Amino acid sequence: MVFLSVSGVSKHFGAHIGVDDVSFELEAGETAVLFGANGAGKTTLLRMLASLSRPTEGEITIAGDPLIGSAAVRARIGVVTHETMLYEELTARENLRLHARLHGVDTTRCDDLLETVGLADRGGERVAGFSHGMSKRVSLARALIHDPDLLLFDEPYTGLDQASLQRIAGVLESLEDRAVIVSTHDLERGYRLADRVLFLRNGRLVGDSRASELASSEALIERYDEYCRETVSMGRQGHPGVSQ
C-alpha cells in the first residue's frame, strides 16, 4: 500500500533547478536510500519531504493527504537534518522533553529513547559538551519521540565516531514498521539498510532499483553509472527506464 507519493516535484532557485520533476512512491515499512554525488539534489528533496521547503511544482502526499498546509500530516514525519539543531545549553533529556511537549507526548518516553540510542547514562549532560556523533544520536531520539510514520535522515553516517556509527545503523535497521528515507554517501551501510535505492543526478531521479537486485555496494555504483550514461545519451527530453 502506497504511503508516500511524490508526484512531479521540482524546486527552482531562480534560474537554477535544484530538483527536477521527481516522482516516486514508498510503501509503509519500506526504506529508501537516496544516492548521488554532491549537488545531486538529495538534501533539497529531503527538505521538501520534511516540509522545510515548498516545492516550486508538484505534490507530496502522505497516506493520500497533501503535505503542504497540513500540520496533522507534517506531525507524522520525523526529521534528522545534517545539522543537529539542538539546544546546546540544555541537557540531552531536556532537549527530548521539550520536543515531546511540543507534540503532546508523554515525557517518560524520553528516557526509553535515550537508552535506544545508547545515551541513557548521559541524559543529564548538556549537549554543548557532546561529540558530533553523540549529538546526532540525540537528534535521532528527538526525531522518534512522537513515533512518526515517516523518518527522514540526511547523511546519518557522516563524521561520526565508531560507537555512534554502530548505534545509529542499528536503530535505523530496526525501524521495520515505518517508512524511512536516508540520504548517505556511505555506500556499504546504505546498501545494507535499503529496500530501495533512488538514484539522483543533477536534480533528476534517473533510476530506482530494488536493493535485492544489487549484489553489493559496488553493484550499486555500477547501476548508478549505468543510469547516468543512459540519461546523458537520451538528453534532457528522455527518461531512462525505471527498474522495479
Predicted features along the sequence, with ranges:
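Conserved ABC ATPase "signature" region
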Residues: 97, 101, 107-122
